[in-house]
């Protein structure tokens, strides 16, 4: 059954436009509360209890109040953490033995967007069947709990402190960050008051940028999706490394002292190498359809199996669980270390990278010796709505030719956009000119 409201990462949209309106979000809280109340999710409590966290968007106050009203109307107790990274909500939901966690965030989007996503009692994203149950409940009229059965709501004051200690616990106890200068860019988002404490308390000399949220500046020129300010600050302060998170701090980008930017594909490779250097067996890792071919080839050359999931950390997680592996990620900086956390966590991913550098005594560039990302050429071709690229004879003929010519030297990926009438043509090759040539030839068949 198709989902009406839930996408791959919860429900998201422009604030004030359906479905991100106070009335819908109230009904969403009520519907989710009904599913929890009748789904055996009380976990030992007298009634189900959920945690609501949010990032720093101005609209978070409005949507938090609406969710709180909906949940309590359904007889569900509510804890509110205030601004907290998405992975922090996942952790506290599990640590406090709660029924579910809810995050109010639109991740790396501008402030005028917002969204709602849920975590299960185990800190995982909700399974499809639970989201379908919530959508079914949304279609029913609201029937409020009796006055003596309404839920209660309260704020928890130590949420940030608990999460800070959890993040620090994932860093090896025999290592520290003394003598390391680190620039942190929190995107004026949910990590602004948390990331500096984590790295400072582990011994780093911390310089913070993107840490003055005003409700409207989240992701605006700062953070993982706009690393230019991080590159400048890392050079200006003579820092050893720069770390950028996005608005809800579930993704990471890294800059070295020379201003070179490292994406999630490279960081995944570094984490695999660190495990192998420590004598741990790494049978396989998971990337996505967009993961650079150079990383796949380098891992396979070392006997590490590599599987590509659909784009989205949700699908990376599914493949990791299916294969029983621990490490996965996307070029965008969503990285998963399932023996550290149940979900992608920018701060914890950064700590794993720093631990690898400390343990090895190497720089990132040295750890990536022998791995140079293949040049990529991406062309977006606008097409008619409903266009089926798989049945386009000209494209298929050109695709067959390109795949034969690139065999062992590159790859082609063609996929439709999920949000607009566009077909994305991406070619990777060891040579940039070769990638450009094939991408332009393929795109020309659609124009």
Curated annotation (Swiss-Prot):
GO cellular component, one term: cytosol
InterPro entries tied to this protein: A-D-PHexomutase_a/b/a-I (IPR005844), A-D-PHexomutase_a/b/a-I/II/III (IPR016055), A-D-PHexomutase_a/b/a-II (IPR005845), A-D-PHexomutase_a/b/a-III (IPR005846), A-D-PHexomutase_C (IPR005843), A-D-PHexomutase_C_sf (IPR036900), A-D-PHexomutase_CS (IPR016066), Alpha-D-phosphohexomutase_SF (IPR005841)
Residues that hold Mg(2+) according to the record: 107, 246, 248, 250
PROSITE patterns (alphabetical): PGM_PMM
UniProt cofactor note: Binds 1 Mg(2+) ion per subunit.
Processing and modification events after translation: Activated by phosphorylation.
Catalysed reactions, as listed in the record: alpha-D-glucosamine 1-phosphate = D-glucosamine 6-phosphate
GO MF annotation terms: magnesium ion binding; phosphoglucosamine mutase activity; phosphomannomutase activity
Keywords associated with the record: Isomerase, Magnesium, Metal-binding, Phosphoprotein
Keyword Phosphoprotein among UniProt keywords: yes
Cofactor: Mg(2+)
Positions of post-translational Phosphoserine modification: 107
One GO term (biological process): UDP-N-acetylglucosamine biosynthetic process
Family from the record: Belongs to the phosphohexose mutase family.
Biological role: Catalyzes the conversion of glucosamine-6-phosphate to glucosamine-1-phosphate.
PANTHER family in the record: PHOSPHOGLUCOMUTASE (ALPHA-D-GLUCOSE-1,6-BISPHOSPHATE-DEPENDENT), PHOSPHOHEXOSE MUTASE
NCBIfam families linked to this entry: glmM, PRK10887.1
Protein name: Phosphoglucosamine mutase
């Amino acid at each position: 059954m198709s989902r009406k409201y839930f996408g791959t990462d919860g429900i998201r949209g422009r604030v004030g436009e359906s479905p991100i309106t106070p009335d819908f979000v109230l009904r969403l809280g009520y519907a989710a509360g009904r599913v929890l109340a009748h789904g055996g999710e009380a976990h030992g409590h007298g009634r189900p209890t959920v945690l609501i966290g949010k990032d720093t968007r101005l609209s978070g106050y409005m949507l938090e109040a609406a969710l709180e009203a909906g949940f309590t109307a359904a007889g569900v107790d509510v804890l509110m953490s205030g601004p907290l990274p998405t992975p922090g909500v996942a952790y506290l939901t599990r640590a406090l033995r709660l029924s579910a966690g809810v995050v109010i965030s639109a991740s790396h989007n501008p402030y005028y967007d917002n969204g709602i996503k849920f975590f299960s009692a185990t800190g995982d994203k909700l399974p499809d069947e639970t989201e379908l149950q919530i959508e079914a409940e949304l279609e029913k009229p609201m029937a409020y709990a009796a006055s003596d059965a309404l839920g209660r709501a309260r704020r928890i004051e130590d949420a940030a402190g608990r999460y800070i200690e959890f993040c620090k616990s994932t860093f090896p106890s025999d290592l520290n960050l003394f003598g390391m200068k680190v620039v942190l860019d929190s995107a004026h988002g949910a990590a602004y008051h948390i990331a500096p404490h984590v790295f400072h308390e582990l011994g780093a000399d911390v310089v913070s940028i993107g840490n003055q949220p005003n409700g409207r500046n989240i992701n605006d020129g700062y953070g993982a999706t706009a690393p230019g300010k991080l590159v400048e600050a890392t050079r200006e302060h003579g820092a050893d490394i720069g770390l950028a998170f996005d608005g809800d701090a579930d993704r990471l980008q890294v800059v070295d002292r020379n201003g070179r930017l490292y994406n999630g594909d490279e960081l995944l490779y570094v984490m695999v190498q660190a495990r192998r250097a420590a004598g741990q067996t790494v049978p396989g890792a998971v990337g996505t359809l967009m993961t650079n071919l150079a990383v796949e080839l380098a891992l396979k050359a070392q006997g590490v199996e590599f599987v590509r999931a659909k784009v989205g950390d949700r699908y990376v997680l599914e493949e990791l669980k299916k294969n029983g592996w621990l490490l996965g990620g996307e070029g965008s900086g969503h990285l998963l270390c399932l023996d550290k956390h149940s979900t992608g966590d920018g701060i914890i991913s950064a700590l794993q990278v720093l631990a690898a550098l400390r343990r090895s005594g190497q720089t990132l560039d040295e750890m990536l010796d022998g791995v140079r990302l293949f040049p990529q050429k991406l062309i977006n071709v606008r097409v008619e709505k409903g266009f089926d690229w798989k049945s386009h004879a000209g494209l298929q003929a050109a695709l067959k030719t390109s795949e034969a010519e690139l065999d062992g030297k590159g790859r082609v990926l063609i996929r439709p956009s999920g949000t607009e009438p566009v077909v994305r043509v991406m070619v990777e090759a060891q040579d940039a000119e070769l990638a450009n040539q094939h991408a332009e030839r393929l795109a020309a068949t659609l124009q």
